[in-house]
Regions:
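Accessory RNA-recognition modules of RNA-modification enzymes
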Residues: 1-327, 333
Length: 335
């Protein structure tokens, strides 16, 4: 049977793509379906059919996989931010290990046994940074994340991956936008003021930065925004506007202005303190980062007679947490 658009077919999902879409085969023909789990038996509705593959959406789950779990996010099926919220964590780790093993063997032609993945102790509310695109509907600001392969915003002010404080920060921005008649940026026209709302948190210090990314040089009622953020956002240390007037989908511009508090927040990794600005590169998952760096230092087995070059290093976390093991170190972000 030849597949055509709008066909409904039964599929057994046997694997996943790197982006988390399920793969099933219909008479040997690959069909990609989002939101499914290996082991699922589903009815898929075909929405695109090409010479070598088809894309479908789930119409019905006939028999759920043993690895399927209930997603803890009400918008995970629409939002493009997560791929594995409906898969057990053990199965997710097994799949990711398999992807690494396959890449080494099939692409790298290397005969290397991949060790077990060191999993996270915390799979929710672990991210220390969030960048929310915004829009305004009927005079009210809403923020969220882009739908899968789209710039359509899925409203989500309570993401399961972000610190709970960020929700309170979004509420402060919503009230300010309504009272100050703030317009949202339109990518098609290049008009509108507010492009993104951006938060950073130091997990070890509790310090939070709130940032408005704007298509302009200033914001209306800035004292009101600061007052609302200070009232609602526990741990607030910095309020910044980032200026991005480019007609592009790049989130941050090169210039930032602090309108309250410090120009940065602080965080600690493995006992070392780091200063983080709006544009700093810094690892997203604090606790997993500490595990990663500790394991890297264990494997490197550095000694006092060695010199470590820390290149393309963001805020220099790897070199800084390693230098106590060394005679000298060089941190250079621009080399």
């Amino acid at each position: 049977m030849k597949l055509s658009k709008n066909d409904d077919i039964k599929l057994n999902i046997d694997s996943l793509t790197s982006e988390g879409s399920g793969i099933g085969r219909f008479d040997g023909f690959a069909v990609f379906v989002r939101g499914v789990v290996p082991g699922d038996e589903v009815v898929a509705h075909i929405i695109k059919c090409s010479k070598n593959y088809a894309i479908g959406v789930v119409k019905d789950i006939i028999k759920p996989s043993e690895f399927r779990i209930e997603s803890d996010c009400p918008v995970s099926s629409k939002c493009g931010g997560c791929s594995f919220r409906n898969v057990s964590y053990d199965e997710e780790l097994r799949y990711k290990k398999g992807r690494v093993q396959d890449a080494l063997e099939r692409i790298g032609k290397l005969d290397i046994e991949v060790e077990e993945i060191i999993g996270a102790d915390k799979c929710s509310h672990y991210r220390n940074k969030a960048q929310y695109p915004v829009s305004i509907c009927d005079g009210e600001l809403f923020a969220g994340f882009y739908a899968y392969k789209s710039h359509r915003i899925i409203c989500n002010d309570d993401c399961a991956l972000q610190p709970k404080e960020f929700k309170a920060g979004l509420e402060a921005f919503r009230i300010w936008a309504e009272k100050a008649n703030v317009t949202s940026y339109d990518e098609n026209t290049g008009k509108g003021l507010l492009r993104h709302i951006y938060f950073r948190k130091g997990f070890a210090t509790g310090e939070i930065m709130a940032c408005a990314v704007i298509n302009g040089t200033s914001i209306p009622e800035r004292d009101l925004l600061v007052s609302l953020l200070r009232e609602k956002l526990q741990g607030l240390k910095s309020v910044v506007i980032n200026i991005n007037r480019e007609k592009s989908n790049v989130i941050l511009g090169k210039e930032s202005k602090t309108i309250w508090g410090d120009d940065y927040i602080r965080d600690k990794l493995l006992g070392k303190t780091f200063v983080i600005s709006p544009n700093s590169f810094y690892q997203i998952n604090h606790d997993q980062c500490e595990k990663l760096y500790s394991k890297a230092m264990e494997y490197a087995n550095l000694n006092k007679n060695e010199t470590l070059l820390d290149l393309y290093c963001g805020v220099g976390t790897i070199g800084s947490v390693s230098y106590t093991h060394l005679r000298a170190h060089e941190t250079c972000a621009d080399l």
